[in-house]
Structures are given as C-alpha cells and as structure tokens.
Curated annotation (Swiss-Prot):
Protein name: Uncharacterized protein RF_0090
InterPro entries: Conjugal_tfr_TrbL/VirB6 (IPR007688)
Predominant subcellular localization, coarse grouping: membrane
Keywords for this protein: Cell membrane, Membrane, Signal, Transmembrane, Transmembrane helix
Domain of life of the native organism: Bacteria
Similarity comment: Belongs to the TrbL/VirB6 family.
Comp. bias (Basic and acidic residues): 633-647
Location in or out of the cell: Cell membrane
Region Disordered, residue ranges: 626-672
C-alpha cells in the first residue's frame, strides 16, 4: 500500500515537473538572440512579449542544425490540453500571429495589436531565425544554428558610397533643429568611404554596359607601392654612400637616417602587418591613425572651447556627457543650430509646448532662476494669429508681419536685415569649415607623395608647403569660430541682456534633445523684461496682438511697445552692420594668421545674400524709374563709370589674391 502511494506521488511529481518545464521553457531559443543596449525591445514592446511565448529547446522543439527548416512551439491559451502548438517553417515562409495562434487566445491571435504581425524565416548571419519587424528594424525572435556556413548575401548597393550618418546623423544631435552637425558628419563619413575605405558597391552585372572605375583607395594602394619602391632605392643609395664614404658611416648619421626613414615610411605607406582586422593582416598607417583624426578634430575642439566662453548664461549650452562617443563634436554645431531656431522664434526651443509634442522632461540643467516666466496667454486669445499655435513654427517672421500690418515698416526692414546678415555669416562659417575639412582629406590622400619629399633637400620645400596647408586648414575654422563666438555674444547681450535660461532635457527612444526656457534673474529682472528677446517672447505667446478692420477684412497686428522694440532692434541692427563689413575680411585675416591659403574663393560669401538683396532692390528701382520714363541709374554716365571702375578694382583685387596664392605655391615649390 505504501509502495502504491509512493508510486502515485512520484508520478504526480514527474507530471508536474514536465508541465512546469514545458511552460518554463518559453522564451528559449536554440541560439542566443541579439540584445539592444537599453533592453527596450526585450522588455517594453511586442517583440519581447512574442519571444516569451515561443519555445525551441523543449523536447517538442527542434534544434537540429542539419535541417533546413525551423521548428518551434507557439504557446496555447491557458487550460489547453497541450501547452503549445508545434510549427515547422522553411526559409522564406511567413505567417501572421493570428495564423499561428488559432485557439482564439486573447493574449496572442485574438489580440488586435499582435494578430497582424508577420513572422518570417530568414538567415541571420550563421543562424536560421524567425524574424519580426520592430521599430529598430527586423529582429529575430527565435534562432537555430546552421551546420554549413551560409552563402554570403549580396551587399546592398543603396548608399554604398555615402556615410550612414547622412540619414541617421540627426539621432546624435541634442538640438531640435539640426542640420550643420549632420552635414559635417555626413561629409566626413562619405569622404572616408570614398578616399580610404574603398568602394563597397557590388560589381555590375556582366550584361551591364556600365563600367566601374577604380576606387580612390585602389589608386592610393598602387601609389604606395611605387613610393615603397622609391624608399627601397633611397635605402640602397644611402648604403652605397656609406660604403664609399666614411662620413656616412658615422653613428649619428645612421641613427638619423633610421629615424627619418621609419617616420616617413610609417606616415606615408604604413608599416606592417602590425595588427589584424577580420583575421587578415593589415598595415598600420600613421597618417590615417593619428594624422587625419588630429587634423579634423583640432578645428571643432578649438572652436568649441571658444564657444563655451561666449553667449548668454545657459542659452544653447548642451550637456556634453549625453553625446555618444565619437559624436561629441555635435556640441559646437548644436549651439549654432539652436541659436538659429531661438533667434527665429522656434516655439519648442523656448519650451512652449501647447500641443504636447515634447512629452515629459527627464531632467533640468544647472542655472536659471527657479521662478518661471509668467504664463503668457494661458487661454489662447482670439486676437493672436493662428500660425502662433502651430508646433515648430518660426514665429519671428509672423511677428514681423504683425508689425508690417500695423504700418511699422522700419521694424520689418530692420528685422529682415538682422535675420539675413545673421544667417549669411553662419552659412559662411559652416561652408568654410566644410571646405577646410575637404582640403584636409585631400591632403591626407596625397600624403604618400609629399611626406617622402622631406627626405631630400631639393624637395623639402614641397613637404613644407603641404604641411603648411594641413595645419592652416585645421586652425582657420577656429579663427572664424572666434569671430562667430564674438558675434553670438554681442547678439545675446543685445537681444536678451541679463536674462537667464533653464535647460530641460527630453528623451524619446535613442533621441535626446533639450529646450531652453527663458527665466528672469534674481536681481535686475526689470532689465530682462525690457529686452528685445523678452518682448518677442510675449508676442510669440500671443500677447500684444490686436485685431481691427482694414477696409472690409479683419487683420491682426502689433501696436504694443513699438517705440522700445524699434530702439532695441536698431541696436541689434547696428551690431549686424558692423559684423557684416568685418565679415568681408575675416577669411583673409584667418589665412594670414595661419599662414595658409585664403578659402574665400571656394566658400559661401558672408555678404552674398545681402548683395543679392541689394541687386534686387536696385533692379526694382531701375524698373520703376523706367516705367515713369526716367533714365535708370545704370544709364547715367558718371554712375556707370563708377560702377565699371569698382568692378575693375574688384577684378584687380581678385587677380591680386590669385597672384598671391600663385606666389605662395611657387614659394612652396622652390628651395629656401
């Protein structure tokens, strides 16, 4: 009797253990699955939920690596006779969740959120996996290893020569409006792919008439072989001289020769194999490992140091610790992009979020008064334009239009001139930086030619000229950045005076961004309230607008604080005009200071937009005079002669600049 009871207890324990094992096995895969760094997909999405309802390691599953299909067990509804249903799918097969969960399970097949998700069997590296779409691309939910190494999938030809940051770089920025940092990173990665990484595009089909040209990296490889052969000949000639002349056999000359030869070889053709990449021996090139990162990293580092010492307290100062490794240079460009949005009235940057776009803040930055600014227009006045309620609108131009409708044409003209000059100067800095970066990459690409020239007395001048251009292009953006930092400091002081700013940090998935709320200082709050920036913020929020009839149509305009706004804006305009004329010579000043080439001929002129506006105004004036039967300004002989003389002087100055560059090049090429 005791034996029978003992047997029953043993059977019950076995059944319970098998049952527990069958349910506890859900979520197990034959091969380990990739995980995200933040664990977001595995814990907070349907992806992780579906993983926890699939079993492959249970005896009903199949981890056989020799089979060309994948077998898995899909969990059934609680209380079913079987804990899960076994399915066998071949590569390329697809099934919806509703097709796999046919028992009307409210947690899976009957769930309106999950039922239409498609699971597809695909090869994933060396595994065969059940893959589902996610917010971060297709991800495997169950995998098994393959006994044979699968044939490599053909590379995707799309964007094979364009940097990945060109379409994902915005995720590394902390500014809501970002384009300059994206442009810099996109160009940097693209140049690296074109010049050094090689052509990753697959070859054309045999029937195609398109012929792929050899990649730049292939040509440089051939060039390095030629330079290597020349260095071997150089070593042989030195050995001959040492054997024929005892002066060359001195310890000092031999040591100097060895040091120079190793440095030239390391930075021109590379030494190796010194390391292994992907199991293949690779050469280590000093110019690519140290020279290029140093030259391209010096400009943003110097410029950012200058920017950190400029500007208002707290405005557009992002948390550098939140930038990912390798993308900290975005801090410089985010500061520029942020100010463009702030000066032009991007409401979200002011932390004005009436539409709930930003979400909840996850933190605050240091500085700023704890007392927030008054809640302007809490109920939404009828007098304000509808454009002020749109998220992401540049409200500066809407406010300028409000002044125009009130007849304040001078304020409109001053505001437009300020915005045009400000954007022109920033555009010049961005293009100047990009041109210098392209020059550095080109100089690095042709470095195998110029670096060995340091070995010979007659060609040493060519190496000095090459080195001078590299160093100048690394330092010129820092000089221009100092000018931009001074400009921004003057603008911040003139527009916001002593106002303070409190940073709000937000995070949505992998994207982190910040806003800056204007705060009144603890002392001297009246001065901040009288500033142009504070009053513009009132207009952005809907204060100060009035609605009245113009003939038969209702219009909305601004008639409040017109005199003070005009005075403050004229002060800003004075600074703009001063910097406008100074910006004409900043390029030449930077080139003279760094003893390098002048980049103004290949960059966007800081006065280009203003010059186009002036030409347009002159054209309209001439057209108006012609319509009245009067001779245009261009037809007057004296003025026309002056115009031609000015053009001739401009041409002479340009040719003089070109001659200076030619003299510099000829000086670099000659001996000292």
């Amino acid at each position: 009797m005791k034996t029978l009871k003992t047997l029953k207890i043993f059977i019950i324990i076995c059944i319970a253990s098998v049952s527990l094992a069958s349910f506890a096995g859900f979520g197990e895969s034959c091969s380990s699955l990739p995980t995200t760094s933040d664990g977001y997909l595995e814990t907070d999405t349907a992806y992780g939920y579906i993983i926890r309802n699939i079993d492959m390691k249970d005896p009903r599953g199949n981890c056989n690596s020799a089979a060309s299909s994948i077998t898995f067990c899909f969990k059934n509804i609680e209380g079913s006779s079987s804990p899960c249903t076994i399915y066998n799918l071949n590569e390329g097969d697809s099934k919806k969740i509703s097709d796999l969960s046919t028992d009307n399970n409210p947690d899976l097949g009957a769930n309106p959120v999950l039922k239409d998700i498609v699971l597809t069997v695909k090869k994933w590296d060396n595994d065969l996996c059940l893959v589902m779409p996610t917010s971060r691309g297709p991800m495997p939910v169950a995998c098994k290893s393959l006994s044979a190494t699968p044939t490599p999938t053909p590379p995707d030809d799309e964007n094979c020569n364009i940097g990945k940051s060109c379409y994902t770089g915005a995720n590394y920025s902390q500014s809501l409006i970002n384009f300059s940092g994206l442009a810099v990173q996109c160009l940097s990665e693209t140049l690296n792919k074109v010049f050094f990484a090689g052509n990753s595009c697959s070859s054309q089909d045999q029937n195609s008439r398109i012929t792929n040209l050899a990649a730049f990296s292939t040509f440089q490889g051939y060039l390095k072989r030629i330079i290597g052969a020349a260095l071997i000949l150089y070593t042989m000639f030195f050995a001959f001289n040492m054997a024929l002349n005892k002066e060359y056999a001195s310890t000092e000359k031999i040591a100097l020769f060895v040091i120079k030869f190793l440095l030239v070889a390391y930075f021109s053709i590379g030494l190796g194999p010194l390391d292994f990449s992907g199991g293949q021996p690779t050469k280590e090139n000093g110019m690519l490992k140290y020279g290029l990162p140093l030259l391209t990293g010096a400009a943003p580092d110097f410029a950012q140091m200058i920017f950190n010492a400029a500007g208002s307290r707290g405005l557009c100062q992002f948390d550098n610790s939140k930038y990912k490794d390798g993308y900290k240079f975005y801090g410089l460009w985010d500061a520029i992009d942020c100010r463009i949005g702030y000066y032009l009235g991007l409401d979200l940057l002011y932390n004005i979020d009436k539409n709930g776009v930003l979400g909840n803040s996850i933190g605050n930055g240091p500085g700023g008064n704890n007392t927030p600014i008054p809640n302007f227009d809490p109920d939404g006045k009828k007098d304000r334009p509808k454009d002020l309620s749109k998220a992401g609108a540049l409200r500066f131009f809407a406010v300028m239009f409000g002044f125009f409708m009130a007849g304040n044409v001078i304020i409109l003209a001053a505001g437009l001139v300020f915005s045009v000059i400000f954007l022109s100067i920033l555009l010049y800095f961005i293009t100047h930086y990009l041109v210098c970066m392209i020059t550095i990459y080109v100089m690095t690409y042709i470095s195998p030619i110029f670096i060995p020239m340091a070995l010979f007395t007659r060609t040493k001048a060519y190496f000095d000229g090459w080195l001078k251009v590299c160093i100048s292009c690394a330092l010129q953006p820092a000089v221009v950045a100092g000018f931009i930092a001074l400009l921004i400091t003057m603008y911040d002081s003139a527009i916001f005076k002593n106002c303070e700013f409190l940073r709000y940090d937000y995070e949505k998935g992998d994207i982190r961004f910040s806003t800056f709320e204007l705060r009144l200082p603890n002392g001297g709050a009246d001065k901040c309230q009288e500033s142009f920036g504070y009053k513009m913020l009132q207009y952005y929020a809907g204060e100060g607008w009035e609605e009245h009839l113009l003939i038969l149509f209702p219009i909305k305009s601004i008639v409040k604080d017109v005199v003070s706004i005009l005075a403050e804006l004229l002060c800003v305009l004075v600074f703009s005009v001063i910097f406008y004329y100074f910006s004409k010579s900043i390029g030449r000043f930077a080139s003279d200071l760094t003893n390098g080439p002048n980049m103004d001929a290949v960059t966007a002129s800081p006065t280009k937009i203003v010059d186009l506006v002036k030409k347009g105004a002159a054209f309209l004036k001439d057209a108006a005079m012609a319509s009245q039967g009067k001779p245009s300004v261009g037809d007057k002989p004296d003025v026309g002669g002056k115009r031609k003389e000015g053009e001739q002087q401009g041409g002479d100055s340009e040719s003089g600049a070109g001659g200076g560059l030619a003299d510099l090049a000829s000086g670099s090429g000659g001996g000292k």
